[in-house]
């Protein structure tokens, strides 16, 4: 694979921390110009400042269609176009079936599912016109298994992301636009290392055949692989990133 990309623009949602921030770094290192979007972007702007004007940060709430349109319009004004869209923004609702309120259910769907649809809807027209595009959706191990804990709203929303991935892939393949998804499990984010107890981490590690959590850099480079121009014959794929925890 050719290492350096020239003159391509990538949009990353949920870019201010964790998997999104790691993805921004990997794309910048590969040569992309990157539009990083999130509810607030101070951290990504600070940590990626060395990349200068190849990075631009925009406030965008993926559950708000007006903000999606405004941010994408600003990105296109600054960079000219959007070639790659990484739908990473997400919300994890810690509630079982009986604990899930209508408000929590709808919030989860607005961010995790509606956000993927409406961001993609906004950017895919330009990709189609130019005859090239890469859409990478972040689903979840839980979408395929129900998850290790009872999180029905989250699992259902991410299952919807996988279905959207299949639908987009079929609709836009003839126009040079691919759409694929990642289904990660136990990526070593701050949430995992700080909010999951040491005892629970030990229990989880026993379930993962490779015996460790996924590094952020490993996650980001899987995104980079699916976003690359040389990955044009891969579409409608869900790439499992789970250390052998589950096989199709």
Predicted stretch roles:
Residues 1-4, 145, 224, 235-248:
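Short C-terminal tail/terminal secondary-structure segment
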Residues 96-97, 104-106, 192, 204:
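Substrate-binding pocket helix/loop in short-chain dehydrogenase/reductase
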Residues 173, 178, 234-235:
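Short, small/polar-rich loop/turn modules that mediate ligand/substrate recognition or access, typified
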Residues 125, 166, 170-171, 232:
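Alpha-helical segment proximal to the catalytic Tyr-Lys
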Residues 16-17:
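Conserved glycine-rich cofactor-binding loop
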Residues 140:
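Residue(s) in the substrate-gating loop at a strand-loop-helix junction
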Residues 120, 157, 165:
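Active-site helix of classical SDR
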